[in-house]
């Protein structure tokens, strides 16, 4: 409702709706914190909506990181997770299903009311949220507020999800026979093969919870989003991808990598938590001589592939730092850990401060699952990559790294010891690797320019703040 003549408009109240699984909520919180800081002069307040378990994890991470406390104009608001109280142990896919069913059945509307109550009755003027929680679109419309979704993955993956119906019509039941066919008839996707598409687009179980979720999201975004935040920066996406998205979503706002928005979100590079001594170990290694290996917190190779990877790292002769969950250590080759520790040639740890590691001058190669956050962290650190994708959008990301941007290589299928040794040697010392290393440095410079004073990402984030706060 507009204020009467002579009355001033109340300050903006932005509801930020999280998808409380994996790293989604943490990424959205980094944006919310940057938004809260930028919008403070307008008197804006933000309500960050997530489940109890998600908020507990965020609070724990904040307490462990200096400077990561909430701004005074940003509050946490707990929302139900949709699970029956009697269910004590619920698998994550089922948790996602229950959460999204609750969201679609009017849950988001109730959450916005909870945000209003927590803000002393202040009406929600804009709904910013993880794009996965697409029911927020209707809830925002009911509240008379615009919906501004945040996409956390790559632009090419978003394009694939939006074009899912057209891709299914094109590929039909021939996905298995056309795995290497380029998607040349689909604007923005001509550099990608059928096999690179995310799970559930043209193959796999279309009714699996996450596949249903992103399909519905892809249908909802073009008709309901007032603007869409993209986790990329101008100059990274090829022109055909940018043009295809702009035709479907005319108000895209690219200002990624999101972790660079606030200096304190990068604080772990200055004084990182490093309980396993990764940085001290790196300090004893040659410049650009170390291969860093990590597949994130979800993906993990099979035991036989882990053994091949371990053998390949040893055969490469390069020092390596490997972040690997401890429950996978028993699958490593006999004596591998002892040999690495005894010679000082390798360090295997259950966790590493990844951004700080990638920025260390001793790291010259990154063996990764090609999750989008990891790709951006490696890219913004100028480190070439060897990608072993497993699921989701990782195959598209690996294809982008190797064939679109050219600052790395991609394994086709499972890793072998010979393949790992060759990839690591090439990235660190090879002639083709020199080209990849140079390309990685070019992209690193583009990121630095985009986030420097007057850079395009800074300008775009200012535009995002204006869109969110003008309602």
From Swiss-Prot:
Q: For UDP-alpha-D-glucose, which residues are the binding ones?
A: 152, 352, 354, 369, 372, 374, 377, 393-394
A Pfam family matched in the record:
UDPGT
The GO terms this record gives for MF are: anthocyanidin 3-O-glucosyltransferase activity
Q: Catalytic activity, per the record? A: an anthocyanidin + UDP-alpha-D-glucose + H(+) = an anthocyanidin 3-O-beta-D-glucoside + UDP
Q: Which GO terms describe its biological process?
A: anthocyanin-containing compound biosynthetic process
Q: What is its EC number?
A: 2.4.1.115
Name the enzyme's class.
Answer: transferase
The biological pathway it contributes to is: Pigment biosynthesis; anthocyanin biosynthesis
Q: What keywords are annotated for this sequence in UniProt?
A: Glycosyltransferase, Transferase
**InterPro entries linked:** UDP-glycosyltransf_plant, UDP_glucos_trans, UDP_glycos_trans_CS
Where do the annotations place an anthocyanidin binding? 24, 161, 392
Determine the domain of life of the protein's source.
Answer: Eukaryota
Q: Where is the active site?
A: 24 (proton acceptor), 130 (charge relay)
Q: Which family does it belong to?
A: Belongs to the UDP-glycosyltransferase family.
Q: What does this protein do?
A: In the presence of other necessary color factors, this glycosylation reaction allows the accumulation of anthocyanin pigments.
Q: Protein name, please?
A: Anthocyanidin 3-O-glucosyltransferase
Name the source organism: Zea mays (Maize)
């Amino acid at each position: 409702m507009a204020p009467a003549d002579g009355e001033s408009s109340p300050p903006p109240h932005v509801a930020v709706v999280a998808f409380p699984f994996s790293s989604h909520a943490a990424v959205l919180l980094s944006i919310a914190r940057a938004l809260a800081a930028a919008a403070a002069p307008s008197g804006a307040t933000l309500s960050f909506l997530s489940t109890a378990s998600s908020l507990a994890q965020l609070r724990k991470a904040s307490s462990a990181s200096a400077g990561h406390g909430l701004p005074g104009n940003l509050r946490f608001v707990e929302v139900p997770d949709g699970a029956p109280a009697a269910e004590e142990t619920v698998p994550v896919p089922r948790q996602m299903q229950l959460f999204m069913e609750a969201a679609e059945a009017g849950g988001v509307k109730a959450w916005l009311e909870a945000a209003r109550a927590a803000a002393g009755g202040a009406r929600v003027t804009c709904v910013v949220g993880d794009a996965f929680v697409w029911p927020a679109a209707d809830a925002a419309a009911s509240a008379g507020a615009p919906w501004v979704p945040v996409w956390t993955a790559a632009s090419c993956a978003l394009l694939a999800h939006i074009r899912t119906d057209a891709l299914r019509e094109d590929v039909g039941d021939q996905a298995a026979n056309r795995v290497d066919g380029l998607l040349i008839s689909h604007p923005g996707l001509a550099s990608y093969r059928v096999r690179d598409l995310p799970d559930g687009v043209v193959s796999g179980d279309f009714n699996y919870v996450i596949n249903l979720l992103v399909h519905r999201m892809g249908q909802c975004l073009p008709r309901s989003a007032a603007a869409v935040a993209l986790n990329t920066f101008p100059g990274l996406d090829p022109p055909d991808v940018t043009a295809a998205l702009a035709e479907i979503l005319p108000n895209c706002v690219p200002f990624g990598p999101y972790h660079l928005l606030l200096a304190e979100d990068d604080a772990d590079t200055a004084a990182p938590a490093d309980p396993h001594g990764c940085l001290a170990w790196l300090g004893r290694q040659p410049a650009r001589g170390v291969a860093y290996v990590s597949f994130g917190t979800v993906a993990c190779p099979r035991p036989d592939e882990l053994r091949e990877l371990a053998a390949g790292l040893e055969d490469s002769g390069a020092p390596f730092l490997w972040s690997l969950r401890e429950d996978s250590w028993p699958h490593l080759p006999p004596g591998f850990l002892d040999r690495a520790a005894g010679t000082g040639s390798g360090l295997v740890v259950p966790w590493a401060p990844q951004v700080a590691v990638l920025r260390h001058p001793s790291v010259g190669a990154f063996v990764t699952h090609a999750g989008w956050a990891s790709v951006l962290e490696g890219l913004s650190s100028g480190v070439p990559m060897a990608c072993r994708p497993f699921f989701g959008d990782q195959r598209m990301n690996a294809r982008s790294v190797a064939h679109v941007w050219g600052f790395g290589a991609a394994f086709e299928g499972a890793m072998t010891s010979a393949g790992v040794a060759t990839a690591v040697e090439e990235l660190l010392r090879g002639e083709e690797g020199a080209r990849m290393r140079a390309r990685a440095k070019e992209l690193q410079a583009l990121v630095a320019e985009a986030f420097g004073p007057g850079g395009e990402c800074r300008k775009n984030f200012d535009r995002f703040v204006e869109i969110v706060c003008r309602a």
